[in-house]
């Protein structure tokens, strides 16, 4: 799989730009702040419907414009598919696949499989659990796009259930009875248990498959600096790490029943996949709080490379993007990383100084300036 062409209209700093890309290595060179990351952010958005930099869509649309448009031509197994997304702040995005409008924006998921490593990924190691849950769920959707719907359904149930609990909490706090009716809570418990079990099962399967890839990737990047491990820690008691849906549904139902009083007292849902954690370890110690800056950077990179390797093991050949990575690495780690990714079907690399790149990665070369991208090699 590779992206043959990317076009942006009123996206971030670009009023209009088009870039023809090549299979193999593509290097985007330019000073910081000229828009290199905006280009790869657009590709990441097509792959995940999320930005790796901001939580909402509004900053993606160029100031003063009503909407931003991303178009990319994706070639997979000899066939080209045009994917288009129109981002309208405050409204549902519109999408097209080929010549046909998509019923929902999320229908484009799976058209472009892409793994992106960026400086923000340091938060995978140092940040809060939500960062690691998002990492798992994004990778889950890349492997099996149907999980986008599972995640959306689960998040909707949590919002509805939280609204009910919050209303009851406020009513009781003020001594009133209006709004304190919890008669429908059992219905939302059932929905949460079913949708939560589906999401939890996917995550457990993913972590089991991913763990050996993480250890191998960290060893390759950090050159024997220690064993890297990952494990899934659920907010409910699980009989085993297996992903049997019926058992997981029962476990979630039991946990919701046991925690009902505490949830009413706090006005929020305290158990479920939205409260779970992906734990990261280096040797016997947790990576968060103990890993050095270099170790944290290598671990974050290993998580992305592991996802890339897992997709390839599944028979998926994703696009790999490395945003401003090599400037953070010493010469030895640069060369080892180049060895790991040199055979990617398509690799996009951004850098401020081309000399930071190992020679084997210097493929098609583009210079990025304010508002324009020019191929120079």
Swiss-Prot record:
Entry keyword annotation includes Cytoplasm: yes
Binding site residues for ATP: 30-37
Keyword Nucleotide-binding in annotation: yes
Protein location: Cytoplasm
One GO cellular component term noted in the UniProt record for this chain: cytoplasm
Listed GO MF terms: ATP binding; single-stranded DNA binding
PROSITE patterns assigned: RECF_1 (PS00617), RECF_2 (PS00618)
Keyword field: ATP-binding, Cytoplasm, DNA damage, DNA repair, DNA replication, DNA-binding, Nucleotide-binding, SOS response
One GO biological process term: DNA replication
Record function comment: The RecF protein is involved in DNA metabolism; it is required for DNA replication and normal SOS inducibility. RecF binds preferentially to single-stranded, linear DNA. It also seems to bind ATP.
Protein family (similarity comment): Belongs to the RecF family.
HAMAP family listed in its UniProt record: RecF
Protein name: DNA replication and repair protein RecF
UniProt organism field: Salinispora tropica (strain ATCC BAA-916 / DSM 44818 / JCM 13857 / NBRC 105044 / CNB-440)
